[in-house]
């Protein structure tokens, strides 16, 4: 269970760093907004899901 928690936490951190860089770049380029909008919403949904998974696993591990 601890390994799964660490894996989910690492995925959350990596996705957070990717979105910190990617979202401002996507907002700064108006010509690709249609394709970027879908990617931003997908990344946001995955991020929220990972936060909930990490919270649940943290409850089970500790």
From Swiss-Prot:
Which keywords does this Swiss-Prot/TrEMBL entry list?
Membrane, Photosynthesis, Photosystem II, Reaction center, Thylakoid, Transmembrane, Transmembrane helix
Q: How does it sit in the membrane?
A: Multi-pass membrane protein
Q: Where are the transmembrane segments?
A: 8-28, 41-61
List, alphabetically, the GO terms of the cellular component aspect: photosystem II reaction center; plasma membrane-derived thylakoid membrane
Spell out the Pfam families in the cross-references. Ycf9 (PF01737)
Q: Name one GO biological process term.
A: photosystem II stabilization
| Coiled coil regions in record | none
* Location within or outside the cell: Cellular thylakoid membrane
Gene3D superfamilies named among the record's database cross-references: Photosystem II PsbZ, reaction centre (1.10.287.740)
Provide the family line.
Belongs to the PsbZ family.
Family matches, as PANTHER family: PHOTOSYSTEM II REACTION CENTER PROTEIN Z (PTHR34971:SF2)
Cited function: May control the interaction of photosystem II (PSII) cores with the light-harvesting antenna, regulates electron flow through the 2 photosystem reaction centers. PSII is a light-driven water plastoquinone oxidoreductase, using light energy to abstract electrons from H(2)O, generating a proton gradient subsequently used for ATP formation.
Subunit relationships: PSII is composed of 1 copy each of membrane proteins PsbA, PsbB, PsbC, PsbD, PsbE, PsbF, PsbH, PsbI, PsbJ, PsbK, PsbL, PsbM, PsbT, PsbX, PsbY, PsbZ, Psb30/Ycf12, peripheral proteins PsbO, CyanoQ (PsbQ), PsbU, PsbV and a large number of cofactors. It forms dimeric complexes.
For this protein, the record's NCBIfam families field holds: PS_II_psbZ
| HAMAP family documented for this protein | PSII_PsbZ (MF_00644)
Q: What is this protein called?
A: Photosystem II reaction center protein Z
- This chain is encoded by the gene named psbZ
């Amino acid at each position: 269970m601890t390994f799964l928690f660490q894996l989910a936490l690492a995925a959350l951190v990596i996705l957070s760093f990717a979105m910190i860089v990617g979202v401002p770049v996507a907002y700064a380029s108006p010509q690709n907004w249609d394709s970027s909008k879908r990617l931003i919403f997908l990344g946001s949904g995955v991020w929220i899901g990972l936060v909930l998974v990490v919270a649940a696993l943290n409850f089970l591990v500790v």
